[in-house]
From Swiss-Prot:
Protein name, as recorded: U1-plectoxin-Pt1d
Organism: Plectreurys tristis
Coarse class of the protein's main subcellular location: secreted
Record note on domains: The presence of a 'disulfide through disulfide knot' structurally defines this protein as a knottin.
Described function: Potent toxin that may paralyze and/or kill insect pests such as H.virescens (lepidoptera), S.exigua (beet armyworm) and M.sexta (tobacco hornworm).
Gene Ontology MF, one: toxin activity
Keywords of this entry: Disulfide bond, Knottin, Neurotoxin, Secreted, Toxin
Protein family membership: Belongs to the neurotoxin 02 (plectoxin) family. 02 (plectoxin) subfamily.
Amino acid sequence: AVKCIGWQETCNGNLPCCNECVMCECNIMGQNCRCNHPKATNECE
């Protein structure tokens, strides 16, 4: 599976953007998001 770390190029401002594995945190421009809070599951590995 895809690692749930790093940056994603899409973020709706307040929605998860990392395949439900982690929540996203938008930057001030609202264009990118940072993946945070990885779950301890195989889906995030």
